[in-house]
Amino acid sequence: MRLIRVLTAVLVLVAGCAPGHGLPPLPPVATTTGYRLGPGDVVRIITFGEESLTGEFRVNDSGRVALPLLGSVRATGLTPAQLESAIGTALKRANLLRNPAVSIEVTTYRPIFVLGEVNKPGEYSYQPGMTLVAAAAVAGGFTYRAIQSYASVMRTVNGESIEAKASRQSFLQPGDVVTIYERRF
């Protein structure tokens, strides 16, 4: 009986030492319509009836999109719909178009980073709907030492970097940094 108590206490102590154990759960992912643009995203901007204002543009490191005739427009933190509105307003103010019709589509998202116990850690392209386990698969799969049931995800939310515990089915966002932990034994 005493041996069982001692073994139980040892198991509880060892389980409490697991990496990432004290992290809060990952907050829910924003929907596609709520997606916020950031540096590294590439957007296709279509200004109907204006070839010169149509094309693919990258959100630069300062969070802006450089457009012909308009110059640079702030994009970081905006949804694609908000950027459509901002460009439309800028076109009106510059007296370039009276009733601009602007459409925006994200063509390339910011990359994700997969670190730790995967076969090929590194930077990978994000695909909408990507889960933690899909990211591990893209990174060559889990190593034999990996904890496969959860991982740590570092994400920027409202300009603040947070780290949280994520399950295999947790959805990722562009720019996430995923760390797959090593099993203790």
Spans of model-derived segments:
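Sec-dependent bacterial lipoprotein signal peptides
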Residues: 1-15
